[in-house]
Amino acid sequence: MKDSYISIVIAYLMVTFILVSSMPIEGEKGELGPHRLPCPPGYENYCFNGKCVHVVAQDEPGKPCYSCICDEFYIGERCGTLDLTNPGYFLKG
């Protein structure tokens, strides 16, 4: 009985993880969201392979916080690293 309960819990957690990990992050594919604004002019090239956003919630006094939403297959603070661990990169034709 205990083993079947553990198996059910593990299966539930696995399904939940798969469902949650497949959901797009808010702002990743659609709207920027209420706490993200487009970066000001002059920051067009801030992100090497992605889109610059102003993260208002992370601002410090006198120091705005800029971040990047990386293009597909790129990772890193400014999207400068090609993610070769992503299997989709090799399947893209």
UniProtKB/Swiss-Prot annotation:
Cellular component GO terms held in the UniProt record: extracellular region
Single annotated GO MF: toxin activity
PROSITE patterns xrefs: EGF_1
Subcellular location: Secreted
Tissue and organ distribution: Expressed by the venom gland.
Keyword vocabulary terms for this entry: Disulfide bond, EGF-like domain, Neurotoxin, Secreted, Signal, Toxin
Superkingdom of this protein's organism: Eukaryota
The UniProt record lists the keyword Signal: yes
Record SUPFAM superfamilies: EGF/Laminin (SSF57196)
Residue intervals of the EGF-like domain: 43-80
Cystine crosslinks: 39-52, 47-68, 70-79
Signal peptide per UniProt: 1-30
Family: Belongs to the EGF domain peptide family.
General function of this protein: Ant peptide with probable defensive activity which acts as a potent agonist of the mammalian epidermal growth factor receptor (EGFR). Mimics, both structurally and functionally, vertebrate epidermal growth factor (EGF) peptide hormones. In vivo, intraplantar injection in mice causes long-lasting (several days) hypersensitivity of the injected paw to both mechanical and thermal stimuli. Its long-lasting effect is unusual for venom toxins whose effects are usually immediate.
Name of the protein in its database record: OMEGA-ectatommitoxin(02)-Rm1c
